[in-house]
Every structure is written in structure tokens, then in C-alpha cells.
């Protein structure tokens, strides 16, 4: 990509999220300039680097390839228990913060913006349900430590995501996140915050979430609908979705492949998986596409005029037909572009990853699907087959 083309693309993205309705976007909600257009532009195209903080980092060459392709944002899930005093010793917390600092330095040097995502596991989630005061204390201590790292980096390049997928009741989270946001704002006065609703941050959970008083906030949703498609071939053999394989997208009751899968599940007595499939077939009858599932978030944005990012979405590679996976990814990012939402694919190189395991490089078809470039995706499934 030439320097001129990079400048033109950046200018186009800044235009798309200004108060002037963009000529190329289908339905962008006009937003007040409470979050700078440059920061929203930085969130426009990204991926999750899950496993970097608590595992092996991606290679610099891979990060450079993705940056050159047009990715501008990396979401860094930080295992919450590794930076909370209740769950980790001082040495472990310090080591985790050093890894985070190194990651932010490298990403910034490559031209990325980064989100620091406080990403809890089962231990914190149990505490969060059982002891609200203790959980709030742990979140505050975690952010006190994370802020020490974040404030050494450019404020316009780092975002602070307060808590991934809060696993408590909506009313309680509303009160907690207002308190937590005020606390983090005191630590990071110039940093844009990212927050989301409960219930796995689903789009249909956002209407029950009130925007914060803090104006410098982006609102994050996660998208994996229909789950029977995106999580087919599930890694846990006890999960009913483990029994579903080769389900195409869109889901159509008249599709011979869908009918064959139903018959197979019936023959194997996979009752729960069959019920989940039938529910998905019924849901897709009238509106099978992403717009059906994402409409509640759009309605919320139209009401409150706040910026949105879909900072998790993806399809498990183990069971999904390849062309259907590409089609779903392309549909999600096309919807996001049409509404001037940012996005971050889940994830880089694991079960949902955009990296081709055989080459260790970005899968070119996945990149075309995500970035909306023309190519083989525009050919019909009938012409290519769906594997």
C-alpha cells in the first residue's frame, strides 16, 4: 500500500465518522465529537491478540504483514487474575505488566493503536457474583497497576477496556461500571475508555445499558450469531455444538446440507444439538443475515449517538465450511463499515484465528473477507463449492 493510498484511506475513515453523513456509508449515525475522529478511525479495523500476554507473542513479521494489509488496532486481552492481588503474587503481577508494556511498545512502533482489555476468567467471575465489594476492589487495583503502564504510552494510541463480558446482572453492572469508569478516568484523564453490557456483550443486551456520563467512551459489543454456526465443532465434547459440523451459512431449511445434518443428528440421537439447529433454522426464516442480530445495537446508537465497536466476532474453524465462514465474516464487517462501527476479529492464530496454520501467515481469503476487498468471495457457492 502506497503512502498516498494510506493517507486517502485515513481521510476517508475520518470523513465516515464525522458529523457529516458520508457518501459511501449506508447508514452511519451522526455522532458528536466526544471521542476524537482520529481515535475512532484507529478502531476501524483490528484483531484480538489473545494469548500474547500469557503466552507466546506473535512475530514482528506477522504484525507487520497485518499492518501493511490495513489493520490499525490490536485488542490485547490481559488475564485479569494475573494483575489482581487476590489471585496473583507480586512477582507474577510485575511480570505480566512487563509483558504488556513490551507489547504496547512494539505495537505503537508498528503504527497500531491498542486496547488494553481486562479479561477475567472463572475465578474472578465467581468473586464478582459472590462478593461485589471485593470484586470492585480487585478491579480497581488491577486498573491502578495497568494505568501505570498505559500512562507511559501516547494517550491517543491506547484504549482502556474496563472489563470483558461482565458476568453479573445488568442493573448491578450499570452501577459498578459508572463507579469503575470514574475511578479509571481519575488515573487516565486523557485515555478513551471502552465499556460494554452484560450477557456476553451481545447486541441485544445494549438496549438495557445506559451510556456513561463520561463522554470519551466507546461502547463494545460481541457478535457470534447464530452460535450454532459460529461455534459448530465446539472443542468441548460435552457441548451440544460439538455434534454439529459442516453447517452452511446462511442457514436455510431447504438447503440439502442442512437437511442432511438434521437427519444425521436425528440418527445419532443428538437431541440437544438438533434442538439448537431447529431454533436457528426458525430464527433465520425471515431475516437470516447479520442485520437481524445487530439491529438492537443500531437502535441503541440511534437513540444515544454513541460510538460502537464490535470488538469480538469470529467463526471457529474446526467445523464450519470454509466459504460459509468467509461469507459470514464479510457480512459482519460490511455491516460495520456501512454503519461506521469499528471491529476487531476474534482472534489471531488459535481456533478462530485469521492466520493460516499451514503457512503462519494471514489467510488471504480471510483478509479479503474482513477488509472488503474484491476477489474470490464474490463468486457464488455453486460455482466454487462450500469447502
Which residue ranges define each predicted feature?
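N-terminal export leaders
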Residues: 5-10
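Boundary at the C-terminal end of the N-terminal hydrophobic targeting segment
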Residues: 23-25
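Catalytic domains of carbohydrate-active enzymes, especially glycoside hydrolases
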Residues: 59-79, 296-304, 333-335, 339-342
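Hydrophobic beta-strand scaffold residues
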Residues: 114-116, 308, 343
